[in-house]
Amino acid sequence: TISIAESLTGGRLTSMLVDKSGISSSLLEGIVCYSNKSKVSALGVKEETLEKYGPVSEQTAKEMVQGIAKRLNSDIAVATTGIAGPNSDESGKPVGLVYIATYYKGDINVAEVEFVGNRELIRTRASVEALNEIRKIILKNT
């Protein structure tokens, strides 16, 4: 089973999965947690993590994926957070910086990726990369 928590991708990743016939047998949920408040309330991201590292960080991505996996006891979970632009965030992290966290039966990995392009392109590239991460988990474990 698969669960997804999206910030910068804003539902695009879930939409890409739902485009595929038969996904209903695997996809449990996809939620968009764009604000810090929703990351805390829906996913259990710690306020201290957001204050110390910011919403766009490896630590936040890790807590997001842990939270979404725990909600419905998913086998596979993915979380995305990043800066789609057009401006960098208040801490100066660059446009295109993306963290994609994956969870598989308790194992968590976080990939830091930088994409070039406009807001639309960065969001699409991040979604495609997250799909690729799901694909790699499935191939490795089947």
Predicted region positions:
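Short alpha-helical segments enriched in small residues
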Residues: 1-142
